[in-house]
Amino acid sequence: MAKNNNEIIIALDIGTSKVLCLVADYDDDDNLRIIGVGQDECTGLNKGVVSEINSTVASIKRAKDKAANMSGNKIESVITGIAGDHIKSYNGNAEVNILNDEVTIDDKEKVIDMAADMDIPPDQEILHIIPQYFSIDGQMGIREPVGMAGKRLAVNIHLITCSSTAKKNLNKCIENSLIDADEYVLQPVASSYSCLLYT
């Protein structure tokens, strides 16, 4: 995640109508706290795809400056939300033998990588690999298999991809605003995290 200074998290949401920049930190109880907000009108995007670079860059800069001034933090890198008609999703699965009859982190990573190794259109790139559930020797619904005993480990995943061109143009706008895009997150996924983790 994009953290500057003492665990500062900075998020950037570039939408069709507005750009929103949020700066957050953690309080003493480790709860996320918003300390800076910047918003500006955006006219350079159409359905999640950049249609005009210069106006998008200007909007990002204004939103960034407002958030930086409110929070008192310099904004150098961000987590960026991404969405649009170019987003695609696929389901995949795979199965591997469990060495030494106990699931290791390597086993878990291997089966996920195998499930994600599928043919996707050449103009798309992987955005998220989301494990839905694991199974061991046919026992389904396992959320965390590491450390469990068994012979065969399987996984079902949900693969989310985005247009490489759309992401590159979005990245160009961010970089031209003198910011590094550390990470891209599908906007509905980011929304689900906020609902499930912070309520």
Language-model features, listed with the residues they occupy:
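Nucleotide/phosphate-binding catalytic cleft detector across ATP-hydrolyzing
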Residues: M1-K18, L22-L197
